[in-house]
A protein has these predicted regions:
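Structural signal for interior beta-strand "rungs" in well-ordered beta-sheet cores
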Residues: 2-187, 191
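Terminal amphipathic alpha-helical/low-complexity segments used for targeting or macromolecular assembly
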Residues: 1-11, 16-17, 22-23, 59, ...
Length: 276
């Protein structure tokens, strides 16, 4: 640790072989282990632990009691060298946890500008994109993928190998074992209810872009076509075929191995779908 502008609390435990970037601070009772690399201007708050072969980029904040890089919670894990790779400008709030990969050389990856609230858990081999928000106590099982700009409400839980599409929103306490297509609102158990219209507006999607995405959503979920027929229609239609938003939507659905969430239908008690 040749840099001199690093602030390390006297009660912190930092291995001499750890690589710590310029301007980084490490709080009281924090632990930074031997194979850790921390970029510039990071803040490792009191009682946080960064362990394993973990690499953090620049300007990250690891909150009080958070644990990054711990062993996977997987009975097949036998001590293989595995990794956590984290980009820049991420915030891990109190007691968030990120496990490293399971199989030799495998990686848990988190991109840039993400926010993980208190108690959020990212299991082994997950992949999180950019500008994702995981609210309090979101639980991601192994190999889950959460794509860019997705928002996951508190206490939502995701089965292993499930994918959450870009710009999707998962309502609090939702249970997922099937993929959530891009732009959609996931509710209940493996169901969608319209688009994440608020998220789309906040991320600069024009009314026309939202209208076209909604039309494609209707083809998939409301046209009466089966999945392959709906995809064929979208990919051959002049209105949709060259639209990059629709291409993202279709490609995600085609790549699904677990199947995509179904349309929410509960008769008179159904949640109201806002189609603005």
């Amino acid at each position: 640790m040749p840099n001199t502008n690093i602030t390390i609390h006297p009660r912190a435990i930092v291995h001499p072989n750890a690589k710590i970037g310029e301007g980084t601070s490490i709080g009281a009772d924090a632990i930074v282990d031997e194979f850790v690399e921390i970029g510039d201007r990071c803040e490792i708050r009191a009682r946080a632990i960064v362990t394993g072969h973990t690499k953090l980029g620049n300007d990250n904040q690891v909150g009080y009691g958070a644990i990054i890089g711990s062993e996977p919670q997987d009975t097949s894990y036998k001590g293989a060298v595995t990794f956590v790779e984290i980009g820049d400008r991420n915030i891990f709030r109190e007691y968030a946890t990120v496990n490293r990969g399971t199989k030799e050389g495998s990686v848990t990856k988190i991109g840039n500008d993400n926010l993980l609230f208190t108690g959020a858990h990212v299991a082994h081999n997950c992949k999180i994109g950019n500008r994702v928000i995981l609210v309090n106590n979101v639980l991601l099982a192994g190999y889950v993928e959460v794509n860019d700009y997705a928002f996951m409400g508190g206490d939502s839980v995701v089965h292993q190998f499930t994918r959450i599409g870009s710009y999707a929103m998962v309502r609090g306490q939702t249970r997922l074992g099937m993929d959530v297509p891009p732009y959609c609102m996931a509710v209940d158990t493996n169901m969608v209810l319209g688009l994440n219209r608020l998220g789309l507006r906040r991320n600069g999607f024009s009314h026309e872009r939202r209208r076209q995405i909604l039309a494609a959503y209707d083809v998939i979920y409301r046209s009466g076509r089966n999945r392959s027929q709906a995809l064929q229609f979208l990919e051959s239609s002049a209105e949709f075929a060259e639209n990059p938003d629709i291409q993202l939507f279709c490609n995600f659905i085609k790549a699904s191995s677990r199947g995509i969430c179904k349309l929410y239908e509960r008769g008179a008690s159904r949640i109201e779908e806002d189609r603005e």
